[in-house]
Amino acid sequence: MVASVPDILRLAVLPVLGWAAWRDVEVRRVPSRTWYPLVGLGALLLVWDAVGHLSLSAPGDALFFVRVGISLLLVAPIAYLFWRLGGFGGADAKALIAISVLLPTFPTYYFAGFTLPVVVTTLGVFSMTVLTNTVVAEGTIAYDAYLRDETGA
C-alpha cells in the first residue's frame, strides 16, 4: 500500500472511532476526552496537507482548500446545530466534528492494481458524505416510525 503519511496516520484513528461507536451503542456514553486527541491530530494533519497545497500551482490545490472549507465551515457547524436541536446525540455530533477535521477530503490509498476509494465523488468532501448518509438513515428511521404510528403496526 502506498499513501501519504497523513493518510496513513488517519487510518490509525479508525480503531478509536470503532470503539466510540461500540461504546455509544452499548453504554450510550462516549467520554468527551475521546474527541480531543482526534481533533488535535486532525488539525496537525490538516496543516501538514495544507502546506503541500499552499503554492496553488497544481489544479487540485485550490480545490483542496474549498473542500476543507466546506468540511470545517459547513459540516462541523451543521453537526453542532443538529446536536443542539436534538437531532444528534452529543457523541454523534462530536464524532462528526472530529471527522470533519480529520478527514476533510477523501484519503487515497494505492494498492497493487487498484486504488481506494474506488468511487470518486463530485464534491470530494468525506465528512459531507458521512453527514448525508447519517441524515438519510435518520430520515428513514423517522419515516418508519411515522408509518408505524399511522398504521398501528
Annotate the PLM regions.
Residues 1-153:
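A membrane-topology feature that recognizes alpha-helical transmembrane segments
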